[in-house]
Amino acid sequence: MTVKWIKKKKGEKPLNITQAVTSVTWGGSVQEAARTAEISVASAPEDKNIKSLKLNIGAGDTIKLYEDGELLFLGEVQASRKTGETGTVSYSCYDLLNHLLRSTGVYNFKNTTAERITEKVCADLGIKTGSITATKVLLKKMIFDGDTFYDIIMKAYTKAAKQTGKKYICRMDGTKLSVQIKGEKVKDFVLQEGYNITNASYEETIENMVNIVKIYNDKNKQAGVVKNEKHIEKYGIYQETYKKEDGVNAATAAKSLLNGIEKKINVEGINGDLDCIAGNGVKIRDKTTGLNGLFWIENDTHTWENGIHTMSLELSFKNIMDSKEYEEEKTKKTKKDKEDKKDKKNKGEKVAHN
């Protein structure tokens, strides 16, 4: 692991500070989107080698992590924490996707695609784009008022996903945002008991169960229903509703809201693979828990300390997208509106037509 620091000042060159770093933690989550890194730097004023680096890392500075010469992470320092007079200073960093999570915008899109929306909002925020997966799904109208840039992108892709049937995920590749199809399998790597698994646990929960979805039209009248009869019989009703959208198959969209028993696995291992990150799939063979097959990574934490690379993964049986539902904005005329319009007409007043 190589760690480089760039001071937030025009013309500053990267400085290799690896010799002063005692540990590195790098991780991510499907739900939180931005990947993070925490580096612990020795605070030893009497050490000549460390003193010569003249470390004065501050908020907004850039930290780069490399493994075997390949860029693993590029992020900005958000906060620092010092422990002890001659202990360590820890720096918390976020990749540039954090700008999309913390910035909001107002947009009115018509007859465009999720990929074009992504290019537009990134350009407005000064974020470069890399590989943006094409959906080729035309979105008739999407209005955003104060949504985060990340939510704008994911709401567009969530809407497109209802027609493509695919799942999407945002990631930063250095300074460029990419939108990829979620669930890519880690190649040529297996987590296996007795080889690279040091601990594994397995749990089941029905906390997020949905076993019946009622479909409604724009007049709030029920137009259909999808359900899981077996789960209803066993666990009782956990109901959700879905309102029809133009250009979207209502039955398919409603079925995507059904959710059964969630099974979560936590695995800790050594000699980890750098492709074992949130959003990817990984194979597991573990006799103790009975786990055998392909699972999807929801959260990952990789740690480098004393020359050893360990990783902790939270896995799921299902490949789940970080869906952001878009609520259609429709002008609704109330009974009072209609009566007022009728009164104006009877009085001979001019009535505006929408």
Regions found by a protein language model. Give the residues of each.
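Extracytoplasmic
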Residues: 21, 32-36, 60, 72, ...
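Acidic, small/polar-enriched beta strand-loop surface segments
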Residues: 1-11, 154, 158, 165-259, ...
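Assembly/oligomerization scaffold segments
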Residues: 1-99, 187, 192-200
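A general structural signal for short secondary-structure boundary/capping elements
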Residues: 110, 123-125, 312-315, 328-331
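Charged- and aromatic-enriched interaction segments used to assemble
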Residues: 83-196, 200-202
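Short, conserved beta-turn/loop elements at beta-strand boundaries and strand-helix junctions
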Residues: 80-85, 299-307
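Oligomerization/assembly interface segments of phage tail-like spikes and tubes
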Residues: 31-48, 88-97, 215, 263-270, ...
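Solvent-exposed, flexible loop/coil residues
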Residues: 21, 25-30, 34, 104, ...
